[in-house]
Amino acid sequence: MDTLKDKIRSEGIVLSEHVLKVDAFLNHQIDPQLMQQVGHAFATRFRDQGITKIVTIEASGIAPAVMAGLELGVPVIFARKYQSLTLKDNLYISKVFSFTKQTESTIAISAKHLNAHDHVLVIDDFLANGHAAKALIDLIGQAGASIAGLGIVIEKSFQDGRALLESEGYRVESLARVKSLAGGQVEFLD
């Protein structure tokens, strides 16, 4: 997606050979027009898959997931990273390790929102080593739901997330595939 790549080039900040900061338009401040285009791109790629729900993880996956949900006309569920007073009973629970934060979190989805009749599109802001995606896949599996595929806004192709997911038979659609962050420069795969 050329618009996304242009935005990454102009506003993304390479913090290291493994970390790309995109808080100017994706995971702190959000560019609504760009997110609308992102949602449209995901909807175009998965429109014929019979999607009934979109699942993401709070917080950075919410904007692209909501825009895709709007385009596809389906609800969006975001896995919460902590249990609250209102999210405590009848939960699907998994653990996820954050590459960026270097911490493990517990994530949860209420069982009343996801069931075996659902066909799910997973959307997330980044794919690095696949830990967040695998945790979401675990939650969806606990519900007995099926997975149409994964929509990733930015994939760090130099990490093994895609290979891990594809080796397990999952379809991965990434809108921007970063080949390298070496020398403080973003180089795209395609």
Swiss-Prot record:
What is the top EC class of this enzyme, as a single word? transferase
Instruction: Give GO cellular component annotations, separated by semicolons.
Output: cytoplasm
The reply on keyword Cytoplasm is yes
Recorded superkingdom: Bacteria
Cross-referenced Pfam families: Pribosyltran (PF00156)
Query: Can you name one GO molecular function term for this protein?
Result: xanthine phosphoribosyltransferase activity
Q: Where do the annotations place 5-phospho-alpha-D-ribose 1-diphosphate binding?
A: 128-132
Tagged with keyword Transferase: yes
Its Enzyme Commission number? 2.4.2.22
What residue intervals traverse the membrane? none
User: What keywords would UniProt list here?
Assistant: Cytoplasm, Glycosyltransferase, Purine salvage, Transferase
Against InterPro entries, the record matches this protein to:
PRibTrfase_dom (IPR000836), PRTase-like (IPR029057), Pur/Pyrimidine_PRTase (IPR050118), Xanthine_PRibTrfase (IPR010079)
Recorded catalytic activity of this chain's protein = XMP + diphosphate = xanthine + 5-phospho-alpha-D-ribose 1-diphosphate
In terms of one coarse class, where is the protein primarily found?
A: cytoplasm
Pathway assigned to this chain's UniProt record: Purine metabolism; XMP biosynthesis via salvage pathway; XMP from xanthine: step 1/1
One BP term from GO: XMP salvage
Q: State the compartments where it is located.
A: Cytoplasm
Q: Which family does it belong to?
A: Belongs to the purine/pyrimidine phosphoribosyltransferase family. Xpt subfamily.
What is the name of this protein? Xanthine phosphoribosyltransferase
